[in-house]
Amino acid sequence: MPLLFQASGTVNQHTFGPGTWPGRLAGDDNNNDVPAFTDADLSGITGLSSFQGRLIIFSGPYITMSSNSRDGKNNFFRTTVTQMLDSDRIEFTATSFSGASFKYGIPFNSDLILASEEHQGVIPGRNQILTPQNATALLTSTYQMDLASEP
């Protein structure tokens, strides 16, 4: 899991190290599986962002968004498997991006702009709150770009 850089409450004092991440409290691997970025067979964590109160972790073509509930901050598992809550974790692949490995997500004009070496896209958020039912990524362009610096 990602490391945390946190203010300690004292002026100019910060801590850096492993954080406490909530585990799976409901379900099993069939109905509440582990996030894609923990899979050793994938490319690991390729980028981080935040959007609409969710921490976003990119892992190759996978986009994983934490829960946005107050109690579920940084929770990457569903809290119940009997119903799908709007605040639950969101995870999907952008199938129209043909193997893109996302590195950056930049909030812009109420949307989230996605960037990889050969694909650019957008997660629309202007007219809606993202939920597991409506989250999608749309391909906007396929230009080659240098990702040495954030767009």
Residue ranges and their predicted role:
Residues 1-31:
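N-terminal accessory interaction module
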Residues 20-151:
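Beta-propeller and closely related beta-pinwheel folds
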